[in-house]
Amino acid sequence: MSVKEQVIAILKEVKPTKNLENEKDIIENGLLDSFELMTLIANLCDTFGIEIDVDKMTPENFNSAEAITAMIESLK
């Protein structure tokens, strides 16, 4: 499974009632609440064995599956 496929699976797990796969403004449109965002970050860290520093926790890095994937790949 590719990084992007894993990211999409995690997004579906965190927010099963909403298809976020093709969404471009997840954060800016308020599609995840604060608890869901923290759950997403924890799941990403666990799945990919990475640490996401506070300076990486910006809307730009979490607005889409593509942005999340790019951030993860930059941290590996």
Predicted segments with their positions:
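Thiotemplate assembly-line natural product biosynthesis machinery
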Residues: 1-19, 70-75
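Catalytic nucleophile serine of serine hydrolases
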Residues: 34
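Conserved catalytic core of two-component sensor histidine kinases
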Residues: 38
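Phosphopantetheine carrier-protein modules
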Residues: 12-31, 48-56
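C-terminal structural segments of small proteins and small subunits
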Residues: 53-74
